[in-house]
């Protein structure tokens, strides 16, 4: 059915009590409506002028009855179409048979067309929006191409690196090329990749010259690379991607957070690679202010203690040298012989027993108001803000400058596996395990 300029379609059902044919139905429509209305609404004249379309009849004969579905296109207005539809229901005979006619629907073709237009326009717009590249995407695409061009190669192994690796005072060591590219997207240009678990010699040499941060994935592979780096390179800081994530898939916000929370190697629990691999958890559970450097006005340089040979016989204590200030200030007393400090601290009740109890455990033990407490170093750091004063602190780990800065105003005595500090307050006494058990 060619709709052309059709505005409405009249759908009609006809039931005849006997057997009739299609031309009988068409004849009844024209014959029984003729003269009912004015000449302006005569079906023959309307059809000749093209204001109504071709009448379509779909007829079936079942059990001696005839059932027909009639469609009549109309380009008349709404009122005239309604009058024409009502006129069709006046048909009561088709050929020799009685018949009934009922209008089932008058469809507004323009509504259907509007719905089609709406749906099609939505589809076209969606396609256009999918294909359209906005200004932001164009900018990012250009930046991405420039960043890709910024990737350089370092050393005889042609390792992927950022453009500032050679000239920067500090570098970030990552796993692969994709990690370098992701950090370039974040504006970080002093990165270099090891390209595998076997650390190249050029990386080993580079870490000796520059402040180095190892930034590895938050998975098992990242742990293996971190172990290798700690064993072969001079690493100063360690940062880990969020647990289960890779550096190349980490967002800019997460990368910046990880790098800001990097942990000095000395702060990692113990002195083993397995402990180092838990640094991401240490970072999450440790308050930021713990890692801030502390400057104290009463610092003195720590000189290497000279241990005099011990001879049999009565112990003769060395004379304590008192440095008198020019002005009237507090007297600063500096022990000349570290052996005397060891002997003095042996008077502290149970020091040797405390040291023996935490050896090879990685734990710390401290005394608060005469009560001994044992924790892991991570638990101790978490609860450090609750501790005001300690009588004594011992840790099964090297004592670094960071630990001294953290505890100098909380305890007068610190004992550790090793003492690796450059300066200490004069009122703080530091001893290694070997000095305690000697």
Swiss-Prot record:
GO terms for biological process: DNA replication, synthesis of primer. Keywords: DNA replication, DNA-directed RNA polymerase, Magnesium, Metal-binding, Nucleotidyltransferase, Primosome, Transcription, Transferase. It catalyses: ssDNA + n NTP = ssDNA/pppN(pN)n-1 hybrid + (n-1) diphosphate. Mg(2+) 2 binds at residues 217, 219. Its cofactor is Mg(2+). The keyword S-adenosyl-L-methionine does not apply. Forms a ternary complex with MCM helicase and DNA. This is DNA primase DnaG. The lineage of its organism: Archaea, Methanobacteriati, Methanobacteriota, Methanomada group, Methanococci. The gene is dnaG.
């Amino acid at each position: 059915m060619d709709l052309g300029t059709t505005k409405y379609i009249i759908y009609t059902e006809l039931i005849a009590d006997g057997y009739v044919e299609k031309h009988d139905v068409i004849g009844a429509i024209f014959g029984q409506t003729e003269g009912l209305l004015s000449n302006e609404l005569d079906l023959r004249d309307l059809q000749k002028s093209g204001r109504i379309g071709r009448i379509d009849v779909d007829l079936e004969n079942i059990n001696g009855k005839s059932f027909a579905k009639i469609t009549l296109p109309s380009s008349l207005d709404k009122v005239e179409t309604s009058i024409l539809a009502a006129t069709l229901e006046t048909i009561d005979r088709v050929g020799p048979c009685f018949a009934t006619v009922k209008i089932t629907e008058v469809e507004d073709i323009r509504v259907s067309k509007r719905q089609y237009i709406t749906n099609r326009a939505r589809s076209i717009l969606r396609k256009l929006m999918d294909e359209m590249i906005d200004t932001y995407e164009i900018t990012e695409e250009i930046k991405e191409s420039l960043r890709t061009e910024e990737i350089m190669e370092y050393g005889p192994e042609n390792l992927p690196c950022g453009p500032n690796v050679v000239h920067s005072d500090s570098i970030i060591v990552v796993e692969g090329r994709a990690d370098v590219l992701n950090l370039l997207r974040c504006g970080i240009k002093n990165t270099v990749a090891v390209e595998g678990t076997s650390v190249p010699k050029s990386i080993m040499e580079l870490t000796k010259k520059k402040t180095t941060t190892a930034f590895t994935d938050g998975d098992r592979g990242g742990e293996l690379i971190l172990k290798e780096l700690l064993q072969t390179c001079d690493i100063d800081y360690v940062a880990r991607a969020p647990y289960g994530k890779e550096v190349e898939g980490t967002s800019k916000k997460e990368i910046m957070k990880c790098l800001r929370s990097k942990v000095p190697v000395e702060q990692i629990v113990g002195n083993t690679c397995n402990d180092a691999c838990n640094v991401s958890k240490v970072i999450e559970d440790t308050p930021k202010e713990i890692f801030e450097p502390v400057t104290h006005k009463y610092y003195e340089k720590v000189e290497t203690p000279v241990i005099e040979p011990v001879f049999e016989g009565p112990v003769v204590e060395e004379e304590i040298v008192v440095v008198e200030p020019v002005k009237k200030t507090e007297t600063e007393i500096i022990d000349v012989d570290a052996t005397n400090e060891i002997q003095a601290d042996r008077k502290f009740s149970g020091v040797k027993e405390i040291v023996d109890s935490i050896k090879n455990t990685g734990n710390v033990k401290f005394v608060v108001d005469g009560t001994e407490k044992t924790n892991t170093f991570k638990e101790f750091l978490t609860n450090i803000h609750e501790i005001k004063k300690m009588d004594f602190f011992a840790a099964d780990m090297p004592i670094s400058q960071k630990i001294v800065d953290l505890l100098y105003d909380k305890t007068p005595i610190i004992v550790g596996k090793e003492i690796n500090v450059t300066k200490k307050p004069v009122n703080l006494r530091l001893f290694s395990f070997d000095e305690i058990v000697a």
